[in-house]
Amino acid sequence: MKEKESLFMHTTFIALIALVLLTGCGRRGRQGSYNDSTAVVQVPIEQLMLPDTAFASADAVKYVVENTDSVATPLRDLDDRYDDSCRVMTFRKNLMRNADFGGRVQGTPTTIEVAWEFSTDRDTTHTSHGVWGGGTGWTGQPLYAKWTDEEMQAFRSSGALTADFGREELFVASLCGKGYFINFETGKLSRQKLDLGNVIKGTPSLDPDFMNLYVGQGVARKGGAMGCEAFDLLKHQRTFYFGPDPKAWRNWSAFDSSPVVVGGYLFWPGENGTLYKYERRQGELRRVSVMRYRVRGVAPGIESCLCVYRNYGYFGDNHGNIICVNLNTMRPVWYYDNHDDSDGTVVCCEEDGVPYVYTACEVDRQGEEGICYFVKLNGLNGTRVWERQIPCKRVELTGKSLDGGMYSTPLLGLGDCTDLVFVNLCRNGADHVMGQLMALSTADGTIRYAVNYKEFAWSSPIPFLNENNELFVLACDAAGNVRLVQGKTGKVVCQTCMGSNFESSPIAVGNTAVVGCRGGKIYKFVIK
């Protein structure tokens, strides 16, 4: 891609901050309640930016920042372009990764029914990490969009639409290396499938401003190269690819992380120990800055997704490092050692004007037995508020090691459960339990209850609210079970079993959920 001058003028401007509680689009309010009013306050962006500081803990992070341009590239605004949309354009929907997807049910549901199922291709290629087949893996979340008339007309010029193209569309990236556009109503292919080049394990991302689709590759076929790519949806073509980075401090160029746009820039963490910052145009990306880092002499990979509060970005990595980065400068603000591999994405919630982040680790480097450390941290300085230690094990399954702990991303409670945080865990035989949906107090980390599974669970839970503001949590496990749990009590109100591993995380649209499995299928469920 040709080098170009900065895409936008960097000038002083005013940020528009909309303090909005939940609406029909499913926007998350600070307390998780309903309110149709919207308060709009104009505040200079300089007053909203969090300070460019570095706490003593950040000294543990040895880093370099490389800038392409001689001019600074500060964030242009602090808008959450994802939370303000009814679309699901990235993993867990918004920048804070705490969104209400918009799942709604009536009363207390009693059934989970299959509306349709979609079959993916199957890839039998032997890679350095085995045969991946089809369906979806971890995190594998679908994307969802409801297009306008103008957008639908623009897509027609691509020549890629099928007879089943419609207003509501899903996109799923598969382990088989193909990308599928699916009609949300019918479950039929709505565009020609995309060739994504390699195994895709993570969740892609739709650009909230341009018709760009971003996809990170997870495993290379036949020992070839892998990296990250962008597709121009108006052309239905790949228009950007970035493979192995010769300057990376870690030699593994996978990108399982789902990138996000913050302040006009695309931020994309890599498993090569690097955080990338790009300028975007239609079909184009231009790198403007990178941060490369080591902790204790090691450059770990980032499989989790970037969680963002204002100009601070939070992520965990393969060595349990939890790092806060100022996205204006790409410099670390604080660091927290959470002991072990942290692939689950950090989630954030503002309480009394202060951001707090929640995350937990796996039992990987600890050995066959260890602790999943679930923590709540102050997002401004990294100070620990509480820690819950949950015993877990690492086990061998059909010749492969299955780490214990948290692979999923926590769900912050809504409605009548704003005092709870929910998480799927892999106990792997610790306390005689394989998997659990656990509900913890956000105040002190006390375990309120746990729903036991007969298999482990990597899939992230999602919320549904009824007309009485009661929360129901939908959670999947590796045995193919889909459960709807009453958030307040832990009672399983209904469930179904598809018999295939749900590693992937679902999305909610109205009273439906869409999720893929390792068995080559994508399912749409209706909750009644």
Positions of PLM-derived features:
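C-terminal motif of bacterial Sec signal peptides marking the signal peptidase cleavage site
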Residues: L22-G24
